[in-house]
Amino acid sequence: ATEAQAAINEXPDRVKKDYFYGR
């Protein structure tokens, strides 16, 4: 898995949205 995938999987919902929409 990529670093982004790991961050999304490990991070909470808030971080998930931030990672998805923020980037």
From Swiss-Prot:
Q: What class of enzyme is it?
A: translocase
Q: Where in the cell is it found?
A: Mitochondrion inner membrane
- What are its E.C. numbers? 7.1.1.2
A GO molecular function term, named singly, is: NADH dehydrogenase (ubiquinone) activity
- In what way does this protein cross or attach to the membrane? Peripheral membrane protein
A Gene Ontology cellular-component term: mitochondrial inner membrane
Q: What is its main location?
A: mitochondrion
The reaction(s) annotated as catalysed by this protein in its Swiss-Prot or TrEMBL entry are:
a ubiquinone + NADH + 5 H(+)(in) = a ubiquinol + NAD(+) + 4 H(+)(out)
What UniProt keywords apply to this chain's record, in alphabetical order?
Answer: Membrane, Mitochondrion, Mitochondrion inner membrane, NAD, Oxidoreductase, Translocase, Ubiquinone
**Function, as annotated:** Transfer of electrons from NADH to the respiratory chain. The immediate electron acceptor for the enzyme is believed to be ubiquinone.
Could you give the subunit structure recorded for this chain? Complex I is composed of about 45 different subunits.
Name used for this protein in its record? NADH-ubiquinone oxidoreductase 29 kDa subunit
Lineage of origin: Eukaryota, Viridiplantae, Streptophyta, Embryophyta, Tracheophyta
